[in-house]
Amino acid sequence: RGKRPHSHRRVLLDRPRLLLPSEFTNACAFCADRYFDTPPEKSRLVKGLDSKFHIIEGLPAASMHDMVAEFRRIPNLFEIVSYDYWHENHNHYPTESQNRRMADYLASAEGYDHVLHVVKMRLEASGENHLETIPDDALLQYANGLFAGGHDVIVARRHYVDGATRTDQNASAGTLSVAEHRAYIGYTIAALKDLYNLNPAVKYVTAFQNWLKPAGASFDHLHKQLVAVDEYGVQIEAEAARVAANPAIYRQILHYVGHRQMMILGNDYAVGFADFGHRYQTIAVWPLGPALLPWEYTREQVDGISDVLHALHCAVGPAVPTNEEWYHRPVDLDVPMRFRILLKQRTSTLAGFEGSTRIYLNSVDPWTLRDEMVELLE
């Protein structure tokens, strides 16, 4: 279906309007003026006087605005796999350090009020009525999930680009500076590794980024999500079986990509190419060298991977809805699965043919996608 006109790929977003000054920091719940509408942060990434990025942990509620957070790691208020699930199925409780963090946070008036506010927000969203009649002690029973859950969000500082004047000038991954994007990727990898320590039953931690509402984002504010799960999932199980049966499969795929001229860009540490076999037009970012876990790469290698991904985000642009999906080897699987990232453009709609046949059409072939991306990168 590669000759279908491209007009169907235009995504209709809300008509832009002029920005109000307050909207730079108050456009959605992820913005800086609304820190107290999200759960207590686990950590933040700040830029120091040395121009380097530093992780700050354990900030009390009263200090939330004392320093600029370039990125924040916060629990997801509406978890995919909830704290209660981990507690009931895997005897999960907060660790000693998490209990101390919770006690310290609740010890201040600002922290106490923040936690109660967030708990009430979640209960209200789930249909709970008459919250004013529920005593604080009962509400605080829900606080464990805000400090010891396994679904985190990595939120960027900006909602709109610096100097924006219209509501369609969102700050995307491609509008970050090279240094900011490198920090974003490194910070996400550190959180990914940390979530494997949530509970012995964690089998996999999935990482992804939904950009814009047509791609599944709750807010048009740049963020990644990480979710600890107690199973590998169909994709990982199937890939592990293929790799075990054919350890050379990744090399063969890269050879095929090169032979069929699907490569888009690369550096010493990673390549990006037009991928195939997906429901949406997809670009793959593959690190080069041995198959490693994401946190086993050196800082230089991570930066190289980040640069390839960042260039692709820049080329795609902030107006295109995308899903960024991370794949890696589960820590307890002894199969040489490769870390890689897929960038899927959500500009087509699955319709009646796909639903009735389970045959999925992609109207953009890999070579058209390659040519488009190369032109945009130039």
Predicted regions and their residues:
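HIT superfamily nucleotide-processing domains
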Residues: 1-378
